[in-house]
């Protein structure tokens, strides 16, 4: 039970840190927020949600008992995904810094978990093909005049990179 309390506390504190990161990212992009929708993030409900959601998900991670690296990786993915979703919901923008962070996290994962150069190359190729396939899938609607934001296409490509071909 103590372990779950620690995970929940780490989730609360991490969520609070990422909440302030989201506030900063919204403030930086305030030039695009002509209707001041980004100001909604100052509402106490958003702060609570930004803290409670990671806490609950971190306890879920604790229940699965992953190894240390995978636990940290999943926690970072959750925090970055919450920020991407929250910022996109508030101001309709997806920060490239978060997408880059997710790409770097997956590259670190490939380096850490691959045993040698052959495994690294296979895993990286698998992830890269996932990126390409996701990108193509989300670009196709644009040819039919369906509106999908460029940030959504980039985010989908990053998710494709993280999942790889086997993730589909």
What name fits each language-model region?
Residues 1-168:
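A membrane-topology feature that recognizes alpha-helical transmembrane segments
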């Amino acid at each position: 039970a103590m372990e779950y309390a620690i995970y929940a506390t780490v989730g609360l504190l991490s969520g609070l840190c990422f909440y302030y990161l989201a506030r900063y990212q919204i403030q930086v992009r305030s030039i695009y927020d002509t209707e001041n929708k980004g100001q909604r993030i100052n509402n106490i409900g958003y702060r609570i949600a930004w803290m409670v959601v990671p806490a609950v998900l971190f306890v879920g991670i604790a229940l699965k008992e992953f190894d240390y690296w995978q636990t940290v990786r999943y926690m970072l993915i959750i925090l970055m995904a919450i920020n991407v979703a929250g910022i996109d919901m508030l101001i309709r923008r997806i920060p490239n810094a978060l997408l880059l962070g997710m790409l770097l996290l997956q590259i670190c994962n490939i380096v850490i978990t691959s045993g040698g150069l052959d495994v690294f190359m296979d895993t990286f190729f698998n992830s890269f093909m996932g990126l390409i396939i996701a990108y193509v899938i989300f670009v196709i609607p644009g040819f039919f005049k369906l509106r999908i934001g460029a940030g959504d296409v980039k985010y989908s490509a990053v998710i494709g990179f993280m999942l790889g071909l086997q993730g589909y």
